[in-house]
Design a protein with these regions (language model features):
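GIY-YIG nuclease catalytic motif and its immediate N-terminal context
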Residues: 1-52, 56-66, 70-79
C-alpha cells in the first residue's frame, strides 16, 4: 500500500509526494533530510492523503495532481 500526500509548506506552497510508509517519510522531511524543496520551506503541515494499492497507481495519481492548477489542488484538499 502506498500513500499519496500533499503538505503545505511554511511559504504556503504545496508539495505532493508518495510514500510506502507515510509516518517515516514525514519524519525524514521534518529532519531536513527529505526533498530539497521541503527542506527550504520548513515547517510544514500534512493537508491531504490518498491510499493506493501499488506504486504504479500512486505515481500516476501524483503526476495528475502535480499537473493541477493551484485552485484545483485547494479544492481537492478541502473536499
Amino acid at each position: 500500500m502506498y500513500t499519496l500526500y500533499i503538505i503545505r509548506c511554511s511559504d504556503n506552497s504545496l508539495y505532493t509526494g508518495i510514500a510506502k510508509n507515510l509516518e517515516k517519510r514525514l519524519v525524514v522531511h521534518k529532519n531536513g533530510r527529505g526533498s530539497v524543496y521541503v527542506r527550504a520551506r520548513l515547517p510544514f503541515s500534512l493537508v491531504y492523503t490518498e491510499k493506493h494499492k501499488d506504486r504504479s497507481h500512486a505515481t500516476k495519481r501524483e503526476m495528475e495532481i502535480k499537473k493541477m492548477t493551484r485552485q484545483k489542488k485547494e479544492t481537492l484538499i478541502r473536499n
